[in-house]
C-alpha cells in the first residue's frame, strides 16, 4: 500500500480553482488547510436554469481578488510568504479556466514563485488529504478507486499514485450525473440547481414506485462500457413518464418520480464503482464532486462498500464541491514529490485528460 506525503511543515501553497461556476482560493501548508474561500455564482446561473459559460467567466473576474484577500486574511499569512501557486488548468469551461490561469500566472510572476498547473479531477482526490476544520491532514491510502460526480463530470479513476499514476477507467458517454439531476428537476418544476431540490423532494417519495432504466448495465453494454456511464436514457424515461401522466390528465407524483430517479442514478454509480474496486483488487473507494452531497448516493455508497468489504472515503462536503484548497493540496504533493513547476507557457485546456495530473 502506498501513501501520499503528509506533513504539517510542508510547502505553503496557494491554490486557484475556476473550472466552472465556483471561484475557489485555498491555502495549505503540506496537508494542513489554512484557508478555503469559495465564491459561487450559482444565483446568477439560476435565472437561466443552468451554468452559462460567459456568466461564469465574468463572475470569476469579479470574485477572484476579494476571495484572494479573504483567503490570505483567513490564513493569517503574508502573500509573499507562499512557496508556490497551483491552479486548475483543466478540464472545465474554457473561459472560466482562462480567468484562473491568467490570475495564477500574474500572481506567480509578481511574487517570483513557482507555478504548478494541475488537473481539476485529480484535485478532487487530493481533497481527501485535508481536514475541513483546519486540523492536520492525513495521507490518501493508495491505490484507490475514485468516483467523481458533479454537474460537469462523472468519472471513475484508478489512482495508484496521486501525482504520477492516475488511470481513467470510465466516464459518462453523454450527460454528467449532475446535469441529469438539473434536467429532471426542470421537468418536475423544481428550481436550479436540481440536485439539492430532487434530494429534498425525494425524501418523501418511494424509490421503488417507478423502475427507471439503469444505463449501460445490460450484459451487452458491459462488454464495451463496463465502467462508463450514461444518463441520457434515464432522463428521457423520466420525461416520457411525466408527459404520459400529464397527457392523461393525471397528477404527477413528484416525490415518487424524484425518489425513483435518484435511486436509478445512485444504483448505477455505486454498482460500477464497487465493480471497479473488486475487479482491480482495490480495497477502498473515494467519492468526490458536488453530487456526493446527495443523501442517497452517500447512503448507498456506505451500504454497498460495507457489503463488498471496501473501505469508503468521503471528504467533508465542503471539500467535495469545487474548491481551491484541493488544488493547493495537490500542488503541495507535487512539490514534495520533487516535480518541476509548470512555468508560464501552458494554457487552459477544457479537455485535459485525467492522466495529465500536472502540466509542464
UniProtKB/Swiss-Prot annotation:
Its cofactor is Fe(2+). GO terms for biological process: tRNA threonylcarbamoyladenosine modification. Keywords: Acyltransferase, Cytoplasm, Iron, Metal-binding, Transferase, tRNA processing. Its EC number is 2.3.1.234. GO terms for cellular component: cytoplasm. GO terms for molecular function: iron ion binding; N(6)-L-threonylcarbamoyladenine synthase activity. SUPFAM superfamilies: Actin-like ATPase domain (SSF53067). It holds the Pfam family TsaD. Binds 1 Fe(2+) ion per subunit. It catalyses: L-threonylcarbamoyladenylate + adenosine(37) in tRNA = N(6)-L-threonylcarbamoyladenosine(37) in tRNA + AMP + H(+). Fe cation binds at residues 120, 124, 322. Substrate binds at residues 148-152, 182, 195, 199, 294. CDD domains: ASKHA_NBD_TsaD_bac (cd24133). Disulfide bonds: none annotated. It is an enzyme of class 2 (transferase). Required for the formation of a threonylcarbamoyl group on adenosine at position 37 (t(6)A37) in tRNAs that read codons beginning with adenine. Is involved in the transfer of the threonylcarbamoyl moiety of threonylcarbamoyl-AMP (TC-AMP) to the N6 group of A37, together with TsaE and TsaB. TsaD likely plays a direct catalytic role in this reaction. HAMAP family: TsaD. Belongs to the KAE1 / TsaD family. This is tRNA N6-adenosine threonylcarbamoyltransferase. It comes from Leifsonia xyli subsp. xyli (strain CTCB07).
Amino acid at each position: 500500500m502506498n501513501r501520499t506525503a503528509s506533513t504539517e511543515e510542508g510547502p505553503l501553497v496557494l491554490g486557484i480553482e475556476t473550472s466552472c461556476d465556483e471561484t475557489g482560493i485555498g491555502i495549505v501548508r503540506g496537508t494542513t488547510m489554512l484557508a478555503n474561500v469559495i465564491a459561487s455564482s450559482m444565483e446568477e446561473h439560476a435565472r437561466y436554469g443552468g451554468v452559462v459559460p460567459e456568466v461564469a467567466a465574468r463572475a470569476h473576474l469579479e470574485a477572484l481578488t476579494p476571495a484572494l484577500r479573504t483567503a490570505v486574511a483567513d490564513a493569517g499569512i503574508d502573500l509573499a510568504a507562499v512557496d508556490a501557486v497551483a491552479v486548475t488548468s483543466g478540464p472545465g469551461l474554457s473561459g472560466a479556466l482562462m480567468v484562473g490561469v491568467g490570475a495564477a500566472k500574474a500572481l506567480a510572476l509578481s511574487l517570483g514563485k513557482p507555478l504548478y498547473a494541475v488537473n481539476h479531477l485529480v484535485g478532487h482526490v487530493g481533497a481527501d488529504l485535508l481536514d475541513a476544520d483546519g486540523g492536520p491532514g492525513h495521507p490518501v491510502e493508495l491505490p484507490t478507486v475514485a468516483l467523481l460526480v458533479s454537474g460537469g463530470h462523472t468519472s471513475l479513476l484508478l489512482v495508484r499514485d496521486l501525482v504520477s499514476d492516475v488511470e481513467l477507467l470510465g466516464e459518462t458517454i453523454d450527460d454528467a450525473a449532475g446535469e441529469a439531476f438539473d434536467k429532471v428537476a426542470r421537468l418536475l418544476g423544481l428550481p436550479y440547481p436540481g440536485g439539492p431540490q430532487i434530494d429534498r423532494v425525494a425524501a418523501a417519495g418511494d424509490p421503488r414506485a417507478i423502475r427507471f432504466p439503469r444505463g449501460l448495465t445490460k450484459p451487452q453494454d458491459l462488454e464495451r462500457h463496463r465502467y462508463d456511464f450514461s444518463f441520457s436514457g434515464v432522463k428521457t424515461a423520466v420525461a416520457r413518464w411525466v408527459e404520459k401522466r400529464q397527457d392523461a390528465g393525471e397528477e404527477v407524483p413528484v416525490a415518487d418520480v424524484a425518489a425513483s430517479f435518484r435511486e436509478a442514478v445512485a444504483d448505477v454509480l455505486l454498482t460500477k464503482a464497487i465493480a471497479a474496486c473488486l475487479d482491480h483488487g482495490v480495497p477502498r473507494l473515494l467519492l468526490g464532486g458536488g453530487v456526493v452531497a446527495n443523501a442517497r448516493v452517500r447512503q448507498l455508497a456506505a451500504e454497498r462498500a460495507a457489503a463488498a468489504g471496501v473501505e469508503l472515503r468521503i471528504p467533508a462536503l465542503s471539500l467535495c464541491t469545487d474548491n481551491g484548497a484541493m488544488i493547493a493540496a495537490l500542488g503541495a504533493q507535487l512539490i514534495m514529490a520533487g516535480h518541476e513547476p509548470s512555468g508560464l507557457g501552458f494554457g487552459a485546456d477544457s479537455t485535459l485528460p485525467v492522466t495529465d495530473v500536472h502540466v509542464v
